[in-house]
């Protein structure tokens, strides 16, 4: 039986311009750690940048694309071109997604990967949607307390070094996608990435900034430093980098499929390095990894159908709960980012994230997970009814049920097949450990290291997500495909940014459906975020007017202004009258290419 325990906020309206803002400031670099070229120190907390009538649209032309027949969007222009070339040569959307993902593993090493994992939602031309889970798993020797010291305090072992890595799923995921839905020969999809790794590619400004920002971590591991910080000097924009060992690893995948990674020389290299560095991944862990096909969640919003990921992704649940709780709220009639708009959505997110953090995990380990109850409209209506005109204390928000870094790509082909694929190392540059030219993930931090203790994203999670051998850690990745009321493909979207993926994806969807924006504006408009704990509303520059800030504080909210890439990087494709519009987030450095 569902019982209400308390809850929250709303009312008060303040007008707010719906023009889009200037671009957010760049992310702050990390502190110097002996890198030869100076590394800029972290800046002090930013002063609030409020929205004004002068705030204008900022949609970078190079990050927009239009195509009458197909569209590819990713976070790296070189990878986007690889995907577009595959489509132009007769491949389908899945082929393009696979080739783009492998290219991202070379040219976008902070998140693109062989040593990580992710999720994909695919809608075939007939309209049927499927979901693939290639999330990493805990090694067989993992234990629930493996990251606690003798006093029971969490250590940094879940974030840095060999013990931070889960068993990678990315290669198995690409192999499974191709086996079920691919069209072109496998080798043709891997070859472009091999060429980029073997022949080299030019480091762009964004990658150079990322290398410099994360140089202290990369310098901890010789195999990472020699590629990205040679002689303790971060690779500069305009320089060319080739990664011969990565080319060899990709050649094995080209020739042997998934077995070329999970068995043989590459697997042996991973197991050997893990043992030498105190990691837990073994050859048996690698050989036993399997990607899992799952039934996507389907939720309704304003006459649209949203197809998104089920657990162990939490993104689909939170997106679905948000849609259900906002069913009766006419967001499009509210001043955009005025008090009532922000307040209503924040309160919905607080409830949805509370359920996410406490109840969700790997369905193979968490029995009787209440997915259906969490998405049931009567339950969501009761939750929505508890929202009041002022903020409810976080202690009074609980699930009322008994019982940077990631990267995303979106593809649509000429038949209407669509792919939203999100893959990750967890934080930027993962564990910092490079094996055979590719970085390993630090996804073990996405487990509950200690109930009640926050992870690197500030998420405070429960025992449902505790570490267990072979278990998939809970994720916030939210690849989503949207159909209109006629059942026609309308929107493909996904993002990067930890738990902010969920709120960034939601705001992109809402901007299109509720406010009728173009896809470029929907992505560029500034964002806000709340994840239940820590209990603050995070505000992007030029997101709200000063009067709205004042009303939020008066209603009991802690308001935190944040700069940089903290609000996620989304990519999306929107159907328009004469084809497809694609947009890469101006917070990142991606590209959209169509034809």
Language model regions located:
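Sec-dependent bacterial lipoprotein signal peptides
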Residues: 1-14
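Bacterial signal peptide processing site
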Residues: 16-19
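Noncatalytic scaffold domains of N-terminal-nucleophile
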Residues: 38-81, 93-94, 98-257, 261-263, ...
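Internal maturation/activation junctions in enzymes
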Residues: 50, 328-424, 435, 451-452, ...
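Alpha-helical support elements that line or immediately flank enzyme active sites
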Residues: 86-87, 172-180, 256-263, 268, ...
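Active-site rim segments in enzyme catalytic domains, especially the processed small/beta chain
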Residues: 106-131, 280-282, 417-485, 515, ...
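Short, small/polar residue-rich loop motifs at catalytic or cofactor-binding pockets
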Residues: 293, 403-406, 475-477
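Extended C-terminal subregions enriched in glycine
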Residues: 470-472, 505-506, 514-564
